[in-house]
Amino acid sequence: MNQTIEEKNKALVLDAFETLFYKRDYQAAEKYWSPNYIQHSAHIEPGRDGLFNLIRSAPDTLRYQHQLIVADNDYVIVHGRFSGHGPPVAWIAADIVRIENGRLAEHWDVIEDEARRESSKSGLPTFGDHFTG
């Protein structure tokens, strides 16, 4: 059975994130990120090197967990949690990635601190089905 472009792109993004965030294999990660990678995040220096340098500078305890991934043609959105990066609370992010020629070519994100039970006006967690900690 043939995969749709959306299925292929979701798998590509998850493989790329695992290679960079978990394995920290920068040489292998180069095959996933375009050398002309465009970075729109206000939190990350420009280009592929900006992202790779950010991860190099992050503590070894950095962890990324995705919860939801959706795709529309060459765009993939991943809802995830970054933890172990230093601040007392995790970050919840929606990462939007554009794929071009089988590589991550462009990135946008929205990041917020993970809500704690006492600060969640909705009474619901911002990631997963339960509060952490």
Please give the residue ranges for each predicted region.
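C-terminal and inter-domain tail/linker signature
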Residues: 1-133
